[in-house]
Amino acid sequence: MEATPSLACANKCVFCWRHHKNPVGREWRWKTDDPTFIVDEGVKTHIQMIKETKGIPGVRMDRWEEAHTVKHCALSLVGEPIMYPRINEFLDELHKRHISTFLVTNGQHPDAIATLRPITQLYVSVDAPTPESLEAIDRPLFRDAWDRLRRSLRSLKDKGQRTVARLTVVKGWNSDEVEGYANLIALGHCSLVEMKGVTFCGKSDASNLNMSNTPWHHEVIDLA
């Protein structure tokens, strides 16, 4: 299941496939739904989506039935999940149902990362190797965005759990400065580094990216 407890984010990344339809903010200022309600509705909606695939040619019924039981939850659908004020209760609710948790954060809320309870896998997005490129790519609302990212990465080494530095490669924007990436990743002693090429999702008034910014697979491998 892919879900999020927060639609809001403190960045306006040039590669955001949501085309910036979600709200932005540096702190939470919206209605706070109950964690159990969010999980209940998320699971219910997930099951409804699975049911709608029953008549598709090639669907195996054993796999279809298995998919009704949520075993894993990726908190990366939209927005910044760690902004949700009751994030730890939300994660506890998933764990009580024996659902593993994979949370992706943009690294702009280091204090929330420090107080986050153990989860299955914690990702921090490392979108740029320098302060200047971070400002250009993430277009953060926080003026101290670079410092926040570095603090977030430093806190990973104290988490005592599996952690990941996630890089989204945008050709011509952040596809060089390998040493800068290496220095950032080293701050967190990350268990893993996940690297992916940006996917061009069509023209948007909020960004001037085009297909030329999508790297070839071999270019991503070379950077890795």
Q: Residues of each region from the PLM?
A:
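Short Fe-S-cluster ligation motifs
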Residues: F37-E65
